[in-house]
From Swiss-Prot:
One of its GO terms (molecular function) is structural constituent of ribosome. Coiled coil: none annotated. GO terms for biological process: translation. It comes from the Bacteria. This is Small ribosomal subunit protein uS2. PROSITE patterns: RIBOSOMAL_S2_1 (PS00962). The gene is rpsB. The keyword Ribosomal protein applies. The lineage of its organism: Bacteria, Pseudomonadati, Pseudomonadota, Gammaproteobacteria, Thiotrichales.
Amino acid sequence: MSLMKEMLSAGVHFGHKKAFWNPQMKEYIFGINHGVHIINLEKTVPLFQDAVNFVGKTVANGGKILFVGTKRQAQDIVEAEAKRCGMPFVSHRWLGGMLTNYKTVRQSIKRLAQLEKMREDGTLESLTKKEMLQNIRTIEKLEKVLGGIKEMGGLPDAIVVIDSNKEHIAIQEAQKLGIKVVAIVDTNSNPEGIDYIIPGNDDAVKSISFYMKKFADAVIDAQGLDRAVEAKADEAVQA
């Protein structure tokens, strides 16, 4: 199946109601159907291919991609696909400063690791019941917000965002730090300042699944390429 047909099947072409449009998206809109803007997939296809290629190249060069999707219908998909390809993710709430104040976030990640170790080795059980419950609650709270980035080990090389409106703080932080931004931009969004714009439906579960699967596959393929290069290097050393 061609990429265009896959997008049509996933409903990528459905934008928002005309009343909610952002005029800056005009060049990516094909027309209106029953009061809803229809996105021009002839524009989306090459832009999406560019974005997927960029993600693959970044990973092949040893880079990390942070996937961000905190809206209800994106949460489970973002988490599952990010885990499948071994990349960090934020799927519940974007903490202000998650990138721009990463030093502080790193301290919270360290705290989470310490508490998890205490739970695993039984140290938590030696505390009073009140202290143990407080620490368990802290673990749950930190895990929910930071669980997806606890293995990130530093700032990402790029972020992939499902909804550029919803995740505007994440985008602003990435831009401040010169981190590349890939984003799904619907007809009600502002495409300005986004490095890799993907005009498309950012609400439908089928569309979100389509994007995330393609990105995760690109990461996995790039990791395979990376491993192949490493294997050749090892063979050369052994020879």
